[in-house]
């Protein structure tokens, strides 16, 4: 998950507590909740990203590092992937995986998504998977992503969304409000934590609204791809090569 400085101290502590407490079961629960479809959605998203060889990538809100490791394979030994997250327990698991994998092109850091510890124009690509909805100020996070991207750089975001077809919408609401918290209780003994995650998915904007937020943050060529009947959406956007200008040419 991602820390947001606009949270109250109580919320900050609560959110950190939630993700630290579910970290040991996080990978297992992702597979159970998505019926193992989360790997397929990520694979489809990465296929659309194209050739990443040699690129520098920031995997924001990296959690236990699943996407980070996939990205490291794609960039190869000449590329670099940094996984950043606020939860120390999530990062401990990610670092344990890294020790087993012995990847030399991955680095894991603890950090704040609202104030990224990187210079302007540091990365070719920024990814964020299922982390944006856990911050109350989505636009601020997107603006930070925009800042650390190089001109022409790309952002790719996978997040929960809201189906529009009635049958999918009803199934989505039933599943997220009732089934997902129940699965969290049964398999991870974490009913309250997964009720909180359900609420974050419920409150998160739909794919079209999120597209508009990307544009508001300064991105161009914003597109999205839906998965799971619209319950999940992958957004793709680009930081323009040309800086914006306030100068207007023409008659006054």
From Swiss-Prot:
Which residues bind S-adenosyl-L-methionine per the record?
64, 85, 112-113
Q: Which residues form a coiled coil?
A: none
Catalysed reactions, semicolon-separated: a 2-demethylmenaquinol + S-adenosyl-L-methionine = a menaquinol + S-adenosyl-L-homocysteine + H(+)
Keywords annotated in UniProt: Menaquinone biosynthesis, Methyltransferase, S-adenosyl-L-methionine, Transferase
- The EC number(s) attached to this protein equal 2.1.1.163
InterPro entries the record matches? SAM-dependent_MTases_sf, UbiE/COQ5_MeTrFase, UbiE/COQ5_MeTrFase_CS
Query: What SUPFAM superfamilies does the entry give?
Result: S-adenosyl-L-methionine-dependent methyltransferases (SSF53335)
* Pfam families linked: Ubie_methyltran
GO BP term, example? methylation
User: Single GO molecular-function term?
Assistant: demethylmenaquinone methyltransferase activity
Q: Give the matching PANTHER family.
A: 2-METHOXY-6-POLYPRENYL-1,4-BENZOQUINOL METHYLASE, MITOCHONDRIAL, METHYLTRANSFERASE
The text of the family note is:
Belongs to the class I-like SAM-binding methyltransferase superfamily. MenG/UbiE family.
The task this protein performs is described as:
Methyltransferase required for the conversion of demethylmenaquinol (DMKH2) to menaquinol (MKH2).
Q: What is this protein called?
A: Demethylmenaquinone methyltransferase
